[in-house]
Amino acid sequence: MGLLDGKAVIITGASKGIGRALSLRFAREGAAVVCAARSADLVKETTAQVKAAGGRAVAVVCDAAREDEVRRLVAAGVKEFGKLDTLVNNAGDGGVTKPVQDYSMEDWRYTIDSCLTSSYLCTRFVVPEMIKVGGGAIVNISSGAGRRGLPYRIGYCSAKAGQVGMTYGMALELAPHNIRVNCVAPGAVEGDRIDRVIAGQAQVRGISVDEMRKAMIERSPLKRMVTADDIVDATLFFCSDMARSVSGQVLAVNAGEPAG
């Protein structure tokens, strides 16, 4: 018996990294997975990997920051699996690394839409489907940057803080419908994205990439970065019946890094 047997889940940002790891693990735990991402090639690759491992999945090419595309995403999930009762809002691009005085409106809108508007839209259109089946679980993948900040990443910090506030508000609003809403706030996650962040931070601070990476690791009491699997484990807990009485919570998965 898997922890998600009988569940039907949408996972956004399922093209690679955390999203791909979520898709593979959730399918192994018994969920039928709607893999959504902007890149057709990558999201189809994720879905192929899920199916090759014996899981159930469908790929939907979708920009989760566009209302019409999210409507189509939800309709496709219901058509394929008959219902939707779980949502992981994982989509989001960290945007550029710049001083605030150089951060353009285009930079701002892109990052807010990618990280925050996408979570709002997916939740808006999935909630009616959850109500139909008597409840569900929503997990927003935020970031430690939304709680403690990160220099030169004002759009990303703001969007991720918005996801935390959204989690609190939706948990209260949706509780009467038996819909639980929680949030996972990763620290630095090993992979291509953190490599780009480190490079950008090093450039604006005038230090080497190696120095920036060392400083980031030293900030963590456990002296390491976290992995995609660490984030998957936390998300799986929130989506499973193990967390049946847990809602409105933010779980920091950050190797012990303080929030403030």
How does the language model describe each region?
Residues 143:
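Residue(s) in the substrate-gating loop at a strand-loop-helix junction
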Residues 8, 15-16, 39:
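Conserved glycine-rich cofactor-binding loop
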Residues 29-45:
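Conserved glycine-rich Rossmann-like NAD(P)H-binding loop of the short-chain dehydrogenase/reductase
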Residues 94-97, 148, 224, 235-236, ...:
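Short C-terminal tail/terminal secondary-structure segment
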Residues 123, 159, 167:
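Active-site helix of classical SDR
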Residues 175, 180, 246-248:
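Short, small/polar-rich loop/turn modules that mediate ligand/substrate recognition or access, typified
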Residues 98-100, 104-112, 216:
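Substrate-binding pocket helix/loop in short-chain dehydrogenase/reductase
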